[in-house]
Every structure is written in structure tokens, then in C-alpha cells.
Amino acid sequence: MTSLVSRESFSLENYHKVAWLGESVEISDSAIAKIDGARSGFLSLLESDDDIVIYGVTSGYGQNAYQRFDKEQRQAHAGKVSFATSAAFGDPAPERLVRGIVFARLVNFIEGHAAVSSDLVGRVAAMLDEDRLPPVPTRGIGCAGEIQPLGHLFNHLSQERVMGVKENLALVNGSPCASALAADVALSARRRLDLAYRFFALSIEALRAPLEACDPSLDLLWTAPEELRALQQLRDLTLGGDPDRRSFQAPVSWRIVPRVLAQAEHTVGRLESVAESSLSSITDNPVYIPPDADNPLGRVFSTGGYHNGLAYPAIDGATASWADLATLGDRQITKLLDSKVSHLPDQLLAKEDGYIGVAGMAAVAYQEEARRAAQVTLLPGSEGGGFGQNDIGAPTFWSFNQYGTAGRALDAVLAYLGVTASQALHVTDRSAPPALIEFLEAIRSMVPPVTDSRALGPEVEILAEQISKAVVSASSTADLEVL
């Protein structure tokens, strides 16, 4: 069980424990005291001034923000459930992501900035003990902020208890979805990148590519830490390989592998940083600031915290990296099959009828899927369904969906790259470097070397699916299992 004490409890590591590993959470006694103290201070502030303006508490929502409520109207307004926000449908979020949103929702509560009761906080935390959470669509989300997905997730709580002033609003405001989306992508991207290293290292060995592209002397010439990490990873994976290398340089698609993997390292690192900062940020609107010397009852004001402007560009960065890696993989598959370039048996034929050349045709289609998904995510160009104040939507779910498409496409290309590299080693009777022996065995357990013509598609699909499963597995690392 993960104990939540303060904002510092909302780390990417704890996100992984709760969202991916299924841990429950416990609100610490000190946090409960702070939550209850903030709730009391907020209510005192509300009672102290009949003319105070607090969005969604003494005023209406959205285009009705101009409306003002007296004390009786405030409580009636607080009890209303906005079922209208549950307008989206399509592609429900995976359970791990929904759990992540619930976890991220709690950060606004933990130090009292949402000014809700500890009872409500306990109800939200208890959702993480349930076997199934309400479905949250990932398509059709075009709202300002995150009222649509959060309405799908939390509206049932508003029916199960009497909600106090501001409590309904605190459930659906802020940007916990963006925090969870960034965290989910960061975790899966790190695992997918780890697998990509192994596939490209296997391809380097398959071609007998000179290892100068990863030469240790480059550590003194290049300065970006991501580049140095990529160089070291590739050196570790290819160590002990065939000493008989090509005597001339490999095609560009092999020589730039360290640089392109370094680009991916950079984008994944940025994602991890954005996820960490987003998870621990207070994003409620309106937000409550506890009492200080100048404001003995605290103060409340409106913010734009519901719009995370860092998450979707960071997710886009990973998507673009997957597209670039898919392009490298496509090029390498084609070159491995072409004896004029690879100096391997033409088309990697083990026998006359063991043709696998169509692999390149499939790969180019999958890499094109990744490239198309890498279109940059921008703020929506139309107000669309925005009314009054709600005139800009948050595009984070769109970037997440594009990332998923590009990731699955890259997995397909990596699967075909692994199969092609495996075939190259088979027809030349070579083994993989020590660090890749088990990895090659896993590939061959799903797609054995081709000795007679057969339909590769169904087998490679299994391998691609195993890659996709590995990147979201509960394990701390992504590994292919021998089937």
C-alpha cells in the first residue's frame, strides 16, 4: 500500500505502483488533518463575505459564470450532477490508465488546495480498491480542461453522497488526466525504447556492421548524455559478437542508430520529467490557498490549471521518435534482404522456396502508419462545442491516441526487423552476441527461421503483440517471453 502524505508522494514511481501494479493508497493522518483544516478555513472564508465571488461555488459554471447564488442557492447548486459532460464514447482507456487518473486526482486534495472534505478524499482513494472502475473513453474528448473524462469517472460519487460546496467541481477540474497520460506514456516509452535497443543491436550483428559507429572514442567527442547512453547501451549489447565485420562502412541507417536512439532517449527523458512535475502539481480551479499573515482565512482564485500545456507536446515527441525508429527499421529490413548491400545470401534464402522478401512490403506500410500518427498535436482550430468561456479544448487525449497508433506500428516494424535479423544469422550459421542470445531465442520461439515458404504474417503478428504487451507489463523491465 502506498502512503500519501503530501505532494511529494505523487511521483512517477508511486504512479507505477498504484496504476500499473494495482497497489491501494492510504491517506496519512497528517494529510487528513491538513485536508480538514483547509475545508474548515474555506467554509469560514465563504461565510465571511456575502459578496465573495468563487467560480462554481457562488457562481454558475462555464457560460453561466456571471450568475450569482445566495447561500441557499449555493447548496442546491453544489448537489447538482453534471451528467451532460458524459458525452464522449469510443476506445475505453485501459484499466491501468483509469487507476492512474484516480491516483493523480488525489494530488489536488492532499494538502487541502481543493478545499474538499476528507470524507470525499477517502471515497476517491477507495476507488483504487475496486475490481473495476467506470469506463473512460479516450475518443471524443474535445472539452476545455478535462470535465468530460472526469465526469465519466467520478459522477457516480456525486450520486452516492451529499456533496458540499465546491466538491463536485473539485472532482472534475484540474488536469489529472494529462498527468496520468504523460505518466503512462513515459512508463511505456521507456520500456519500448529498451526493446528497440535490442532489436537494432541484433540488426547490427546480422549485417556484421562495423562497430565504429559505437566506438568508445566517441564518448570524448559527443557531449549529450543521451548520446553517451545510447553508445554504451549498443556497445554492451553487441559485445562478444562476430569478430569478422564488414571491412567498409554500413549504410546510413545503421551508422546513425546511436544518434536516433539518443533522440528517443531525449524525448523519453523529457516525458519522464513532465510526468514527474505534472503528477505533483496542484491544478485545481478555483484553487484554495491556506491562511497566511495577509489572508487569515486563506484565499480562492481561478486558474488555468486544468490545461496542461507540457504533456501533449512531450507525448508528441515520443510519437515522432517512434516514427523515426520505424523508418530506420524499414530501411534496415530492405537492406538486409538485398545482397548487393548486405553481402549476405540474397533475400536471405535458406532454400529456393524460403522467400521472406515481402516482409519489406509489410514493414513500409507499418512505418507509414507511424509517420502519419506523428502529426503534431496543436490546440484545436475551432471553438467547436465551446460555449462562452470554454473556447479552447485540451488536446492531450488526441496526442495519447496518436502515440498508441505509432507505438503499435513501431512494434510491427521491430518484429519484422527481429525476424529478418534472425533469418540473416540463420542462413550464415552465426549466433547472437551473448547479451542477445535469450532475446533471439524468444524471437525464434514465435517466428522460427524460414526454411520453407510459409505465411509469416500470423507469426510476426504474435511477436508484435508480445512487444506491445511487454511495454505495458507490470515488470520493471520489458522482456520478450519465450512462447
Functional labels for PLM-detected ranges:
Residues M1-S48, Y66, A78-V136, I141-G142:
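Alpha-helical scaffold/interaction cores of sigma-54-like transcription cofactors
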Residues Y61, V107-N108, L128, G142, ...:
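Acidic, glycine-rich active-site loops and adjacent beta-strand->loop/helix elements
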Residues T2-F42, S48, R74, P135, ...:
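C-terminal auxiliary extensions adjacent to catalytic cores
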Residues Y55-F109, P135-L157, M163-A180, A311, ...:
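FAD-binding core of FAD-dependent oxidoreductases
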Residues D51-V53:
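Metabolite-binding pocket within alpha/beta catalytic cores that recognizes anionic/polar moieties
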